[in-house]
């Protein structure tokens, strides 16, 4: 018990100790000293994520970031639809489903294309180098979905020359298994990272099992000290169950969810200017049985259909940041997003077996440009102004 308490104490100290020259990329499109930004940013680094040994980044963020709260319902997993957990709120903004709080991966928005809310089980620790949480509005750079704040997952990189492989395994109560294997390579300008995981639990209640498996891969190449290209892909699948209330349990409330994302970016970094152009594509397939209860007062019978949906989100982003004179930084950029999907009830039994009941089929487009101006007045005062149209 003493060892566990000491580990938690050390973990908290590491996460909350910021070095004087720590740089972040959230709240700004270029690496910037955190002291020069007009908003509060918390950083949870890779060491803290590894010490916590959580398959999802959300439990770690809840422990480490002031004002951030997430709902949970069991040993592992959050699920989707009715009875799901994973709702996030930051300084009172958010909730379930999460709105006003934007989740990013390397600056790209991550949410379900149909419902517009994040999928908590998709944000796995295996891909994260660090997580930057901006507490406050950031709509100039990221749009109206970031009114309450931003959670930006910065993906892992291979920093050290050579080949390294890590394997983590854990087993505990309720037949709970956590596993992760990662291989990292860096040779000259070439870098690669491949990681896979398998996690499962029976849960502490009947019909509360959870199973998740997936993988993450990232390749990069530095053409010169000033230009580089990188691409990555992440796919995860999870099976979750909703047990219902203890006094009125649910039967067959099962979910089978697949989420994926991929991106490609070309970056430039010079002494006085830096920028990037990137493309990303996110997708998801949901197969959900709403289940039923055995209480006759509920008048809730087994459903002859399953909710079946496919959603996606595609985007192209460009920005360039320049230092015009001492203490100045001017950033301009354009974002284009296309998102949507289709949903239906698919009958799997009964008289309508094989039929499909249309629910929605839609696609939306969004384009915006922005300019951000920042000027250091002194070592303790910075002027920041921006506009997004």
How would you describe each model-predicted region?
Residues 7-50, 58, 269:
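Short, acidic, small-residue-rich periplasmic hinge/interaction motif at the N-terminus
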Residues 41, 49, 61-62, 131-133, ...:
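Non-catalytic regulatory/gating segments with a bias toward low-complexity or hydrophobic composition
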Residues 59-108:
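Extracytoplasmic beta-strand/coil segments of soluble accessory domains associated
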Residues 92, 181-185, 217-221, 264-268, ...:
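Residues on the lipid-exposed face of transmembrane beta-strands in outer-membrane beta-barrel proteins
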Residues 108-135:
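Short acidic/polar hinge/loop motifs at secondary-structure boundaries
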Residues 138, 150, 154-185, 196, ...:
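Short strand-turn segments of transmembrane beta-barrel domains in outer membranes
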Residues 184-200, 228, 234-236, 275-302, ...:
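Surface-exposed extracellular loop regions of Gram-negative outer-membrane beta-barrel proteins
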Residues 201-208, 212, 226-313:
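Flexible loop and strand-edge segments within Gram-negative outer membrane beta-barrel domains
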């Amino acid at each position: 018990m003493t060892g566990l308490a000491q580990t938690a104490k050390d973990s908290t100290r590491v996460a909350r100790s910021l070095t004087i020259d720590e740089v972040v990329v959230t709240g700004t499109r270029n690496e910037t000293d955190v002291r020069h930004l007009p908003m509060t940013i918390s950083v949870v680094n890779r060491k803290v994520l590894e010490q916590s040994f959580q398959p999802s980044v959300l439990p770690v963020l809840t422990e480490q970031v002031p004002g951030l709260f997430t709902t949970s319902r069991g040993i592992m997993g959050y699920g989707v639809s009715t009875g799901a957990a994973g709702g996030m709120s930051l300084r009172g903004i958010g909730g379930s489903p999460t709105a006003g709080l934007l989740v990013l991966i390397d600056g790209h928005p991550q949410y379900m294309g149909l419902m517009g809310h994040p999928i908590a089980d998709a944000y796995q620790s295996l891909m994260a180098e660090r997580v930057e949480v901006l507490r406050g509005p950031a709509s100039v750079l990221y749009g109206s979905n970031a009114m309450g704040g931003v959670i930006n997952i910065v993906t892992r990189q291979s920093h050290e020359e050579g080949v390294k492989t890590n394997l983590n395994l854990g087993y505990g109560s309720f037949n709970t298994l956590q596993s992760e294997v990662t291989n990292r390579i860096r040779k000259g300008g070439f870098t690669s990272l491949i990681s896979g995981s398998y996690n499962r639990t029976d849960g502490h209640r009947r019909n509360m099992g959870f199973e998740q498996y997936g993988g993450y891969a990232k390749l990069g190449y530095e053409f010169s000290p000033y230009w580089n290209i990188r691409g990555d892909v992440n796919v995860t699948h999870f099976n979750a169950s909703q047990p219902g209330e203890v006094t009125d349990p649910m039967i067959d409330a099962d979910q089978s969810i697949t989420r994926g994302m991929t991106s490609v970016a070309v970056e430039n970094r010079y002494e006085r200017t830096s920028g990037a152009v990137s493309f990303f594509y996110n997708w998801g397939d949901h197969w959900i049985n709403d289940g039923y209860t055995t209480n006759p007062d509920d008048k809730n019978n087994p459903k002859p259909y399953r909710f079946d949906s496919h959603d996606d989100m595609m985007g192209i982003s460009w920005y360039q940041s320049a230092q015009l004179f001492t203490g100045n930084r001017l950033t301009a950029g354009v974002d284009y997003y296309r998102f949507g999907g289709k949903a239906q009830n698919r009958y799997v039994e009964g008289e309508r077996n094989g039929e499909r009941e249309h629910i929605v089929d839609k696609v939306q487009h969004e384009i915006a440009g922005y300019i951000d101006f920042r000027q250091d007045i002194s070592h303790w005062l910075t002027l920041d102004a921006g506009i997004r149209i």
